[in-house]
């Protein structure tokens, strides 16, 4: 039943008075606290209450007081008379759409002279669009074709190598053989051969090739430095060329990280006396960047995600002869999924050769997963490394902590943080049980002083004072060689750096101290690979990035802090957690291996022998500790079957709870229907290479014509923001970031402002770009990556029909890009329901804000946010990208949003009455005051928006903003006009002293 929007409008065209109802400014329930009886005057508790009852009485009274304060703080949703009348006419006109002959000729202008009118679409047109959509859905489910692709170039760019044919070519076979023979006389090739022959893998060349040729799947295990990544692919290619069938060989080797794919490809090309790519034998392909090799007789190194993307275009990888999955022991989510896909693919591609390459410790597990396929081990190439445990270090350097307020061993238990998995709790119990016997055993071999220090050590923290003392000892007592320190995160790296620099000795030019972290400027990090001059000692302080991603050749001393930052996903509370946890045995082994690459080395582990015996063999696979929404969409777009069924066949299947929660979230997002099939929106989100909420934001940025800034935000959220934090300049960097915020109260718009400033500086020349990045602590490499990603997103939108140009800056797609409020509305559309409420706390000393979420209660804005110290908010709602529990629950990347943003782009709307207040609520908890007639207008407009958006998603085409008679233009213009003109929302009935605070 439709609502009559005329019923609330008086005959003279103005709004009817809503009446004061239960009148006048509050008063009301004076005695609501229950007062009465003797002592109950002036808010005191009743005299008959005793002990705990008194506390409960006051708690109940405070709860009632808080609820009433919250009621009074509700913002008022209102609109002026002119807009109200216009929207009444618009909605009544749209309701008449079933009358085929009615075509409203209404046209009017908002106060900003922004006219919007309506033209009723015919039923015939709607039916034809639905019919077209049904045909397309049928295509999606039955054929391997792209959904509504009008321009295939955006798919083909990263798939160029895959889409090339691989047919036998006798002429090419002969040419490849001649080229290889010619290489053997090339001085560069000969020099490289000398190096290659020293690698352990080189002596096993014949054995490796025979095993691969005679089996469909082979597992190769080998220690760091054995040469498996660079040599195995070359052995295969050269064998094919020498057998005269080189054109049939197309090897693709996956790498878990971009930096690895590039560096390995360049190394292999150099070993073959060639340049990387350019039609030679070796190249690489990573997202938005490639140097492709020749079409046939070639090796391509690529990131795992590239293969998953290829599978959308060719589910059988028809043109690939060999697929090498490298570093699979790392167990990242994409490699685990790809293994299962490849396992299924083997049934259809009996000619496909699969080579799995892993570190030594768990090769058997991969062999078992692939039907007990053959394994071969390549020995490592490292010098002996002496290992020291915590008790050895304390004894060796005679360490005694200056501060004695260390906590007990068992105050927080085996694991730091909030990860309470059963196996961890069991290990904690074992640790506590064995500790007395372990200490007793140590007393026979170590001094009493060492035992005392061990007893007082705080297991929760990495002892940075101990590390500083150990570095000093190595520098003064041991021989030359670089020192590599492994720490969990940025805060530890920063503190240790400060500790060292506070000592006069380390300030001299005899030391080069290099922090290595993703937040650090990359220009500083290039020094890490350079050999230092004689007399200068390099000290590298790094996270686990230095375990496998990069190799620092001159390291002799490794200090293993014993902890690693690990993200988990708590399915019960629907929250990500990050904590510093103990390393696994595999981590410890990798760290030890960093010390013996060029000469005998030393590795110092900052945990005791009992702890070492209880370490996990490996880190928990990523798929068991991460949200699965993006993966679920990939499973559906690749047509891999039912989500739960496919995930159950992984090497380590995620929990049923995690799968159910992800499917539920995707249904709430309207990406999956009740049968777990992709909706039209789901198809678009699955094709975008970002997580679903960011994908939805991208689509809305196109629909609401604020494309360029929204793509900047989406790229930053899915990659990383461009800010860097040089050590010692943290406060200046924070100040510069707040300067870029420009009073937007938005981390997202801060990135937009930073990016636009960079674009302007870049247009003026390299020197201006460099100065701009230096002044505002920005990474030009990251900004360039964001620029490239924006181009990729725009091509996806063009291919799907949402925009008419591949340029993010196309004027037609950016009509509203200068309007901050509309951009915030689109951010809200993408990130909802990630909403938090702000409450202004007017304390005696200074104003403060408290932030709450529906499920967690009190939370904190992350210290790096531009909103962390903000008190003058215009509204009291934030939308955020990420909620993570570390030492407390933090909100990352948040933006203040207005009531209309939440009403039009949030959840379900309901209209209710709360005592004397008429209210409109979003999902029952985001509540605003609103006269009933206004609430019905908003709800009616929201309903029309939902219908329009559904049509746009099912049959994408750009909005024609010049067609002021169309329904699309009329509805969108009315909504955008309300959002743009939303005033600061101050509740009508707040006490006068609070009127300087803004609410909504």
From Swiss-Prot:
<keyword id="KW-0067">ATP-binding</keyword>
<dbReference type="GO" id="GO:1901534">
    <property type="term" value="P:positive regulation of hematopoietic progenitor cell differentiation"/>
</dbReference>
<comment type="subunit">
    <text>Found in a multi-helicase-TICAM1 complex at least composed of DHX36, DDX1, DDX21 and TICAM1; this complex exists in resting cells with or without dsRNA poly(I:C) ligand stimulation. Interacts (via C-terminus) with TICAM1 (via TIR domain). Interacts (via C-terminus) with DDX21; this interaction serves as bridges to TICAM1. Interacts with TERT; this interaction is dependent on the ability of DHX36 to bind to the G-quadruplex RNA (G4-RNA) structure present in the telomerase RNA template component (TERC).</text>
</comment>
<keyword id="KW-0010">Activator</keyword>
<dbReference type="GO" id="GO:0043330">
    <property type="term" value="P:response to exogenous dsRNA"/>
</dbReference>
<feature type="region of interest" description="Required for the pre-miR-134 transport">
    <location>
        <begin position="1"/>
        <end position="96"/>
    </location>
</feature>
<keyword id="KW-0007">Acetylation</keyword>
<dbReference type="GO" id="GO:0034605">
    <property type="term" value="P:cellular response to heat"/>
</dbReference>
<keyword id="KW-0238">DNA-binding</keyword>
<dbReference type="Pfam" id="PF00270">
    <property type="entry name" value="DEAD"/>
</dbReference>
<keyword id="KW-0694">RNA-binding</keyword>
<dbReference type="GO" id="GO:0090669">
    <property type="term" value="P:telomerase RNA stabilization"/>
</dbReference>
<feature type="binding site">
    <location>
        <begin position="594"/>
        <end position="597"/>
    </location>
    <ligand>
        <name>ATP</name>
    </ligand>
</feature>
<dbReference type="GO" id="GO:0001503">
    <property type="term" value="P:ossification"/>
</dbReference>
<dbReference type="GO" id="GO:0051607">
    <property type="term" value="P:defense response to virus"/>
</dbReference>
<keyword id="KW-0399">Innate immunity</keyword>
<dbReference type="GO" id="GO:0045944">
    <property type="term" value="P:positive regulation of transcription by RNA polymerase II"/>
</dbReference>
<feature type="region of interest" description="Necessary for interaction with single-stranded DNA at the 3'-end of the G4-DNA structure">
    <location>
        <begin position="257"/>
        <end position="309"/>
    </location>
</feature>
<dbReference type="GO" id="GO:0005524">
    <property type="term" value="F:ATP binding"/>
</dbReference>
<keyword id="KW-0677">Repeat</keyword>
<keyword id="KW-0678">Repressor</keyword>
<dbReference type="GO" id="GO:0051891">
    <property type="term" value="P:positive regulation of cardioblast differentiation"/>
</dbReference>
<dbReference type="GO" id="GO:0030154">
    <property type="term" value="P:cell differentiation"/>
</dbReference>
<keyword id="KW-0378">Hydrolase</keyword>
<dbReference type="GO" id="GO:0003730">
    <property type="term" value="F:mRNA 3'-UTR binding"/>
</dbReference>
<feature type="region of interest" description="DSM (DHX36-specific motif)">
    <location>
        <begin position="45"/>
        <end position="67"/>
    </location>
</feature>
<dbReference type="GO" id="GO:0070034">
    <property type="term" value="F:telomerase RNA binding"/>
</dbReference>
<feature type="region of interest" description="Necessary for interaction with single-stranded DNA at the 3'-end of the G4-DNA structure">
    <location>
        <begin position="490"/>
        <end position="549"/>
    </location>
</feature>
<dbReference type="GO" id="GO:0043123">
    <property type="term" value="P:positive regulation of canonical NF-kappaB signal transduction"/>
</dbReference>
<dbReference type="GO" id="GO:0003723">
    <property type="term" value="F:RNA binding"/>
</dbReference>
<keyword id="KW-0391">Immunity</keyword>
<feature type="region of interest" description="WH domain">
    <location>
        <begin position="621"/>
        <end position="690"/>
    </location>
</feature>
<feature type="region of interest" description="Necessary for nuclear and nucleolar caps localizations">
    <location>
        <begin position="1"/>
        <end position="192"/>
    </location>
</feature>
<dbReference type="GO" id="GO:0007283">
    <property type="term" value="P:spermatogenesis"/>
</dbReference>
<dbReference type="GO" id="GO:0060261">
    <property type="term" value="P:positive regulation of transcription initiation by RNA polymerase II"/>
</dbReference>
<dbReference type="GO" id="GO:1900153">
    <property type="term" value="P:positive regulation of nuclear-transcribed mRNA catabolic process, deadenylation-dependent decay"/>
</dbReference>
<keyword id="KW-0479">Metal-binding</keyword>
<dbReference type="GO" id="GO:0006359">
    <property type="term" value="P:regulation of transcription by RNA polymerase III"/>
</dbReference>
<keyword id="KW-0597">Phosphoprotein</keyword>
<dbReference type="GO" id="GO:0032727">
    <property type="term" value="P:positive regulation of interferon-alpha production"/>
</dbReference>
<feature type="short sequence motif" description="Nuclear localization signal">
    <location>
        <begin position="509"/>
        <end position="520"/>
    </location>
</feature>
<dbReference type="GO" id="GO:0005739">
    <property type="term" value="C:mitochondrion"/>
</dbReference>
